[in-house]
Amino acid sequence: MNILLTGGAGYIGSHTFIALREAGFEPVILDNFANSHPVVLERLARITGQPVTLERGDVLDTPWLEAVLRHHQPVGVVHFAGDKAVGESVANPLKYFHHNIGGAVSLLRAMAAVHADGSAPQQPTLVFSSSATVYGDPTTVPILEDFPRSHTSPYGHSKLVIEDMLSALRQTGAVSPASPAWRIGVLRYFNPAGAHESGLIGEDPADIPNNLMPYVTQVAVGQRPHVNVFGSDYPTPDGTGVRDFIHVQDLAAGHVAALRTLLDHNKSFTVNLGTGRGVSVLEVLRAVERTSGRTVPFKFAPRRAGDVAQCYADASLAKHLLGWEALRSLEEMCADAWRWQSANPNGYRG
């Protein structure tokens, strides 16, 4: 059974590719490599022992997407493609609205077209890569799926708008009168971290990392002088931001569980994917120091626009609906992230 992964060469997409292949699916990667590296494909082939099927192009190109869908006839689509940096979205909101919202509209139109004309035999089935940023700045934690939604950045706003589009599809049942009802799984990620245990693939930002873990490991490996800790006066135990860090392989397993649930039970859902445990920035730094045996220098800096004090999940609904839960610890995330970074000091660039 083919599964199309938009943005499948990216950090989460590449790990999900492995999990899907191990689960017996045939994942097909769709990517334009704007935020990823072609060498990932070679690494995936080494890990899985099989060649990787790639469709190179842009998710904004609707006619091309239609042709890809007709050719591969996937039983499901996992939509990762998009821009993902909170800070950048504040500085350049139109980029995020165009790429993220426009890309989602393009994909939905393409899926609707191939199902409406009978080119695809299955119900349109989509797993969407959403984000905990749709909860804005929550007043209490842990966060449940029925908490009020909001946003503190254009990135979060783009995810919220896409969720609303998908909700409308679920309520109306179709994009057009001729297309069948949709099966949609919305996965609200918390903070992905770690890497594949092989050390062959991991998180490799094209520029200065926006996520904490790759920044810390780049400092530990000597690529950067120190970690900027944005905010030391949050109302948290040590004054730094608290997040729910989830191992990327646990997150990948969540996508497999989501697809199986949609295909087997024909029921749409929205769930959190997190560990349910909040960890502060300083706690992550200390964990990486223990794992790597290196000192990680840091400096406090002003809070970043769009950041919130604390954000961690109640993931009990995912366990109930999908039979999924996060299994790996913070120490395992740090160990795998360090293995990747130390083996690949310059990431995929050699």
Predicted regions and their residues:
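N-terminal Rossmann-like NAD(P)+-binding domain of SDR-like oxidoreductases, especially those catalyzing
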Residues: M1-A195
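Residues at structural and domain junctions
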Residues: P27-L30, V75, G82, P93, ...
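C-terminal substrate-binding subdomain of Rossmann-fold SDR/epimerase-dehydratase oxidoreductases
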Residues: L212-G350
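Glycine-rich loops and low-complexity Gly/Arg-rich segments
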Residues: V52-R56, V78-F80, G102-A104, S150-P154, ...
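Pocket-edge positions in alpha/beta enzyme catalytic cores
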Residues: G57, L69, Y96, D146, ...
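Catalytic core of nucleotidyl cyclases, primarily class III adenylyl/guanylyl cyclases
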Residues: S198-L200
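Glycine-rich, flexible loop segments associated with nucleotide phosphate handling
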Residues: A120-L126, S179-I184, A206-L212, T240-F245, ...
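Short-chain dehydrogenase/reductase
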Residues: F97, I101, T152-L160, G202, ...
